[in-house]
């Protein structure tokens, strides 16, 4: 499908909020972020010593998220107060796993770190967590909400398999990776919120897949700088595009068509997720606020005609906190 047909294929993107600009913008999210983002000690000093307090481990997770997963940090701020610290712990756990691949020079070292987290999860469920800030906070979350161990292990197992620097063979392989990582994260978030609902699970599955696809697109310039390309090979072959085309940042139409096809799949998952909104408990909506950031990226990539390397796609959206707050206030996702 040609990229120029995006508008008719996707329909309108629901990012604007008519009428709200005349009201005083809600400021609670920024105020909450300022309160929670004060400087904290480094990971080494937080984890060391026997006097590590609850606030120390909690603040370590906050700072890790603020630096490494800012969108997840903002979304977590809008969860109910009683669920917030557990969500921070869960996302910090995900960050710890996600950054292993890019922080090691050898796969063997990465496997050792994954093994550490597998043992950590086992120890958490044996009420014997290691003296590591994220592990301690995750242990508290597991005890507080009786989180399902299987989802945590799925995230580790899938991240471990992804240590191989191989492109996804097809879009289904990328979706499977996203299901086992991002969707699993959302299933656990629903458990933190006390939600047991089949429709909410279906929505979480689609949102997680959309998140995984968008993350793959967003990370392509970074991976390209390290001479890696992970976009689905079947779609690249369909349009006659090689990995070298992405490495040299080609502006050719067939390269943009690859990006269009991949982005369209993310858009389709968002559409499916929203089709459940009338059947899902309103209490579950805060778990799905990341759709705001996903749709923002998809709108931007449409505006630049699917030029994956356009500078505007690398800029942080300064209005994202406001957009998230408004969607939360409207009880939408």
Swiss-Prot record:
Source organism of this protein record: Bos taurus
Function summary: Involved in the assembly of mitochondrial NADH:ubiquinone oxidoreductase complex (complex I) at early stages. May play a role in the biogenesis of complex I subunit MT-ND1.
Span of the transit peptide along the chain: 1-44
Predominant location category: mitochondrion
Keywords from the UniProt entry: Membrane, Mitochondrion, Mitochondrion inner membrane, Transit peptide
Xref: SUPFAM superfamilies: Terpenoid synthases (SSF48576)
GO biological process, one term: mitochondrial respiratory chain complex I assembly
Family annotation (Pfam families): SQS_PSY
Lineage: superkingdom: Eukaryota
One GO cellular component, as annotated: mitochondrial inner membrane
Family, per entry: Belongs to the NDUFAF6 family.
UniProt entry tagged with the keyword Transit peptide: yes
Subcellular location as annotated: Mitochondrion inner membrane
PANTHER family given in the database record: NADH DEHYDROGENASE (UBIQUINONE) COMPLEX I, ASSEMBLY FACTOR 6, PTHR21181
Protein name (database record): NADH dehydrogenase (ubiquinone) complex I, assembly factor 6
UniProt entry tagged with the keyword RNA-binding: no
InterPro entries: Isoprenoid_synthase_dom_sf, Squ/phyt_synthse
